[in-house]
């Protein structure tokens, strides 16, 4: 294949696609250049069907530091595990691609996106999503695309497609929307309390832009696309399926309708175990035993899938007996834990999350060093999903992609209502521990996070609640479900999470298993979600009406002082010696920013006060006409040097010791004496002159007489302008 180049202009930037030059051994590959961002995407497929009961799709997004002209940090000076942002981008690409493969497709597929050059104003994430779809579409992999995605901003009442970095900083919306030419199939968003109408309009504007990108892809596929490979799909034996359905469908239907989760799972598993045992015995010696038992498991899964959907669409009955727009029983509690800075426990049916707040000095903020310039991250929301929350055993270790994604969703939802750094100069960390799960645990973590923030005294602008919406669709008719549980999520067509305040939406996330959904479904889902959100907010506000006016006793207190920028080095000292000494002496934590704002943190107010005194002393400046209680530290013939405070000395000239003539400095003061002085002059070099006599009553002038007019009178000599420190 020879190199071919395709060009267009999209959202004000040139979009260039190159095929046939690099990574030619992959099933499909493309280089996408958007602005000055360059992404190489390669897609490959295994030769045979995988043995698992799921589609093994892997999407990677690799950030190479050289792409931004940056040298890797760390000991190895090499890229390591993917950053959080890279992991989230990989998920963002995976989600719209996954529904576009045929039911029963089980070959392993890998899509690897490598960022080769980085332009912060031309999204490499969207270039990678475009490249992923294109590489699959032009390959022989049986992909039913194409799809595409765009970012949408909202600035001054206008929607912007793929906004620049500067536009993102002032945007009220951070939305990624992806889909096919016919419908939206993935949404990820954070927003500053925008209305449902604005969000819906943004989604539709984004989809219009997606259609442009898909049309461009279709041109490229028509020019260089390969013929799709014939692959084996997972099909069950139809005779076996009919036999099992006839014999056991009624038993499974009864089991599915058990309302309580654990009891329902036990009932359905009992039916499955019974069927499995029958067919294991029946085909024990059959040469295709493994295939038959795989078919049995798949048939039972399909039967349960069909019954759950039939109940909802035909009987309008959910597995736990709720109405389609009904929320499970709610409960909320604050101060669940002692000693911590804030805690909230939120329960919705059999889904329960505990959120724990920790406040820290700004020096504890996370430093993020990726392709963007290094920055500090003030707020973190971490989500943990232990296997015991669903009554199972499983792996323990570092958080997986799902946990990272759910944590990021909660972070977006809550960060919109956090106070500014000026209002609340703390680093903030929330940790959500999922204690029970039967669906919508990410939204429970948002509700619990709101409780923890308010209980901990963080002055958030408004409480935030989240709800997960579902969808069951048969192509012609559909049913939107409020507050989906695990079974409805597993067998449903959509997981649409909506979080926000009473004023508007702060976060959205949508994943679907069908090829797309319409504006009508989106509108209905948003309206039902708003009603449910308000119901949850009623509970939160009844539990804790407003953020507490004070922090927890165990939380670090803070005090701030402002110093001149040129004094920062004095407080820090050589190699940090001075500031380290203050910290060691007082036990506080100290942060100093480049503008001279000094923040002092401690749970002990006395320690804060002591540190403030020390710092104030270090940066204190003498002022003309101010009086100081000083100590004599050195004596010279022309005067005495006194220490005003800390490292600031002043010269009291011999003529400023007293109103009477002084011939010998030591006749008036000795080293170690404590005296009151007034500053009378500070020169351009910062040298200070002080006076003792200025604080003493001036003696009356002597009576005039002829002899006093003698030119050689000593008073005449004394009245000559005295020498100062700067003239010595």
From Swiss-Prot:
Q: What cofactor does this protein call for?
A: Mg(2+)
Q: Which GO terms describe its biological process?
A: mRNA catabolic process; RNA processing
Compartments annotated for it: namely:
Cytoplasm
Catalyses: RNA(n+1) + phosphate = RNA(n) + a ribonucleoside 5'-diphosphate
Q: Which domain of life is it from?
A: Bacteria
The family line of this record is:
Belongs to the polyribonucleotide nucleotidyltransferase family.
Which PANTHER family did the record assign?
POLYRIBONUCLEOTIDE NUCLEOTIDYLTRANSFERASE, POLYRIBONUCLEOTIDE NUCLEOTIDYLTRANSFERASE 1, MITOCHONDRIAL
Report the protein name in the record.
Answer: Polyribonucleotide nucleotidyltransferase
Organism equals: Streptococcus gordonii (strain Challis / ATCC 35105 / BCRC 15272 / CH1 / DL1 / V288)
> Which gene underlies this protein?
pnp
